[in-house]
Every structure is written in C-alpha cells, then in structure tokens.
C-alpha cells in the first residue's frame, strides 16, 4: 500500500509539472510559440496554425549555436512547398541548442509543431519580453480574427 501511495504521488507530481509547463507557453503575432524551460531558458517553434498555413515543410535552416539576437530579428528560415518564411526571436537572447533532427526530418515541424518539431532553445534574461507575449486564450482569439 505504501509503495502504491508513493508511486501515485510521483505520478500526480508529474501531471502537475506538465500543467505548469503548458501554463508557461506564450505565442507571438508571427505564429511562433515560446515555452519557458526555467533558469532563463526557452524553447521556440512555430504553431500548428503556422505549419498548416505553410504546408509541407521541406527544409529548416539550422541557426548557429551561440548567436546573440535582439527581439524581432530573424532566427531561421522554414521552407515549405508553398513558401519560405522567416522565424523571429521574440526576446533578446543567445541560442544554446538547435534541433538537429530537423536537418534530416524537417517534416517534424508539420507532424509535431509544439513537440519534437521545436526549432531552437535560447537563453534570455528578458522575462518582461516573455510575459508580454500572448497566452493561449489570447492567441486563439488572435487567429480567429486574422
């Protein structure tokens, strides 16, 4: 009985952690999503709405690790059968990790845009810039209007 309780507590704790992580995702007017990973680290990708608009993704330019960018600068390019689209960094930051899987499997952006299709991770101390982005409800309303 004690082991079951301990397992249940861990499982419950994981569920809370997942919910907390979803709460920390913000969205841009350019249809990018940003998730706070803690310790001033963030993960960036494009939204499901964006990948549907682009169509089949055929290439993702892998940015340079260590590159320092200002809010609003292009961070990479995503190419699809329809168009090439710049992806912008929504906060001042420095790239720490890139999703190398996208070099050989750019379709991950279509298949799991908010999962394995993430593009970069970066470090930023500009939490005010993160907080100024849209939450999920605001973003859902935004895409209805546009």
UniProtKB/Swiss-Prot annotation:
Cofactor-binding details, from the entry: Binds 1 lipoyl cofactor covalently.
CDD domains, alphabetized: GCS_H
Alphabetized UniProt keyword annotations: Lipoyl, Mitochondrion, Transit peptide
Superkingdom of origin organism: Eukaryota
A GO biological-process term: glycine decarboxylation via glycine cleavage system
Range of the transit peptide: 1-30
Transit peptide keyword on record: yes
Cofactor or coenzyme needed: (R)-lipoate
Ranges for domain Lipoyl-binding: 41-123
Pfam families associated with the record: GCV_H (PF01597)
NCBIfam families with a match to the protein in the record: gcvH, PRK01202.1
Annotated family: Belongs to the GcvH family.
The protein's assembly and partners: The glycine cleavage system is composed of four proteins: P, T, L and H.
Protein name as it appears in the record: Probable glycine cleavage system H protein 1, mitochondrial
Lineage: Eukaryota, Amoebozoa, Evosea, Eumycetozoa, Dictyostelia
Gene: gcvH1
């Amino acid at each position: 009985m004690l082991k079951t309780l301990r397992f249940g507590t861990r499982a419950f704790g994981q569920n809370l952690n997942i919910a907390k992580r979803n709460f920390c995702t913000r969205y841009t007017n350019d249809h990018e999503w940003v998730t706070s990973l803690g310790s001033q680290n963030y993960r960036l990708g494009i939204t499901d709405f964006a990948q549907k608009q682009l169509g089949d993704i055929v290439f993702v330019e892998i940015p340079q690790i260590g590159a320092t960018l200002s809010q609003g600068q292009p961070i990479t390019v995503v190419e699809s059968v329809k168009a090439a689209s710049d992806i912008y960094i929504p906060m001042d930051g420095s790239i720490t990790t890139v999703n190398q899987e996208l070099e050989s499997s750019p379709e991950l952006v279509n298949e799991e845009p908010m999962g394995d299709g993430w593009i970069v991770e970066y470090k930023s101390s500009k939490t005010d810039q993160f907080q100024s982005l849209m939450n999920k409800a605001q973003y859902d309303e935004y895409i209805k209007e546009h």
